[in-house]
């Protein structure tokens, strides 16, 4: 995915929709995959807060804490009332336990070892994990930036997190793992 829009919260949604034509389907499928009404939610890569907004529409009693590594996105999300911390997915996760850890279009930035490590830490601190992301596919529909976008096969990620693929379209997938 092109880096030019990653830092600008004002243009991010339009740009991501231009690059990923099924972006809204991915978001909807991710929210649909939530296995229960969560209370404590950790979102990895909160960005503009779009996933949090959609989650709260469906689960208004949820309390969401977000993480993002981009200061511009953290500032934007905070301006819109989202509790978000400046942190990378490689950093220790905020203390759980969490009912749900959720992520949309963030995990593909980690290499395979980074993904396995993240999934191990998520499993230790949560009841469930739902992820919607770009996955390795042939053909690769989503434009990728070399060295930045590192998609893995959906089947591998499902195995690594102890989950299952619950939705797939082109080179996008939603994976859900329930741990309790």
PLM region spans:
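Conserved alpha-helix/loop element of class I SAM-dependent methyltransferases that forms part
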Residues: 21-37
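A conserved beta-strand element that flanks and buttresses the S-adenosyl-L-methionine
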Residues: 102
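C-terminal lobe and adjacent flexible extensions of AdoMet/dcAdoMet transferase-like proteins
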Residues: 175-180
